[in-house]
Structure formats: C-alpha cells, structure tokens
Amino acid sequence: MADPEELQVSSPPPPPPSSPSSSDASAASSPGGPVSLGWPVPSRSSGPTVDQLEEVELQIGDAAFSLTKLLEATSAVSAQVEELAFKCTENARFLKTWRDLLKEGYDSLKPDD
C-alpha cells in the first residue's frame, strides 16, 4: 500500500498564497492559516490516521497470508481427491473384471442343457 508521505506528494499542490480563490479569502486573510481547497489536507494530528492505515495494512497482510495458506491447503486436498478418484476408478475396474470372471466360472460349472 502507498506510504502516507507518497499520498501527500501525489495530491495536487496548493495554489500560491498570492492568488487565493474566493473560497480561500477568509483563510488567506490570516497569515500562515490553512488554505481550504475542497479536498482533505492532512493536519498535524494525522497520527491516528497513519496508525489506522498501518493497522489496515497489517490486517490486509494477515488476510493475504491466511488466504495463501488456505489456497495451499485447498490445493493439497484437491490433489488428494484426484488421487482417490483415480484409485476408485481402478478398484471399480478390478471389481468388474473379477465379477465377470466369477460369472464365467459359475456358468462353466452349470450342466449343459
């Protein structure tokens, strides 16, 4: 995720103090006052916001790790299911062949009419 400093760099720069817009007239009249441009400008009290961003990033990282582990486990189970299906198919083929042989043997022991 983007670093908070990168977010500040990517936001549009404020206009020069010499040309304030009409909505900035009251803020520009006090020297050194903040200039409101209609988008959120991080203030010095942005510490909790940065902490919240870091917490969200950690939660996303934890979720991604958990999802990766879940994918690995699902892949392993999927491979086991495929192997089991193959073995079941082999067993079914064997049982069918065995049944056919038993039937032939039984039929060969019957007296001819």
UniProtKB/Swiss-Prot annotation:
Record's keyword annotation contains Cytoplasm: yes
Top-level division of the source organism's lineage = Eukaryota
Q: Name one GO cellular component term.
A: cytosol
Question: Tissue expression, per UniProt?
Answer: Expressed in the kidney, in epithelial cells in both proximal tubules and distal convoluted tubules.
Q: Where does this protein chiefly localize? A: cytoplasm
Name of the protein = Renal cancer differentiation gene 1 protein
| Location of the region described as Disordered in the Swiss-Prot/TrEMBL record | 1-50
Q: Where in the cell is it found?
A: Cytoplasm
